[in-house]
Amino acid sequence: MSFLVGVTGGIGSGKTTVSNIFFHLGYKVYNSDDRAKYLMERDSDIVEKITDLLGESAYRKGSLNKKLISESIYKDNSLRKKINAIVHPVTINDFHKWVNDNPDDILIKESALIYQTSSYKELDCIICVSADQDIRIKRILARDKYRNEEDIIQIMKSQTINNNKGEFKPHYIIENNGKDLLLPKVIGIVEKIKSKV
């Protein structure tokens, strides 16, 4: 049975960069966001439900209208919950199939919503990537030309979890404010994980 490692963090924190380091170190990575987008375009049941919810403009020539969906779900909490209820169960099943198809000693799951979707319960180890908000905003503005600062702050708010009870504790935290190299940090965590497997 594989040792499942979750890599999480808010938008712009650098979790994909950390996941890419794992990939280049030879580990298989399941990117929840990429797979969700793929399934939102290819799974006919999801396409039908999202079209019913948002209308024909949710898709352009078979491709997801990311700008419309992003603007819609981050401004309307109830709509975001409806979309998540459509997409998350399919993505979770897709992840389980991926795990079964890849019986490696260590597998990586990247997801911004590890705690929000309760998928943390099936992971053996969680790495949280964090960065200061102003740095995250700059990164996202440089990467996503269709977003503005207001949109980004809305997304950040939607990804925030209520941790008043202190139940959500990652095993490792990687600070990613651009001051230190990430590779040595990830390698150090890999060595610790390998000692547990």
Walk through the language-model features, giving the residues of each.
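Small-molecule kinase domains that catalyze NTP-dependent phosphoryl transfer to phosphate-bearing small molecules
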Residues: 94, 121-122, 143-194
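ATP-dependent NMP and nucleoside kinases share a basic, alpha-helical "lid"
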Residues: 93-101, 106-142
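P-loop (Walker A) phosphate-binding loop of NTP-binding proteins
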Residues: 10
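Post-Walker A helix-loop "phosphate-sensing" segment adjacent to the P-loop in P-loop NTPases
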Residues: 23-32, 44-45
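ATP-binding Walker
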Residues: 13
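Hydrophobic anchor at the beta1->P-loop junction of P-loop NTPases
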Residues: 5-7
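Walker A/P-loop
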Residues: 16
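ATP-dependent small-molecule kinase phosphotransfer cores
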Residues: 34-103
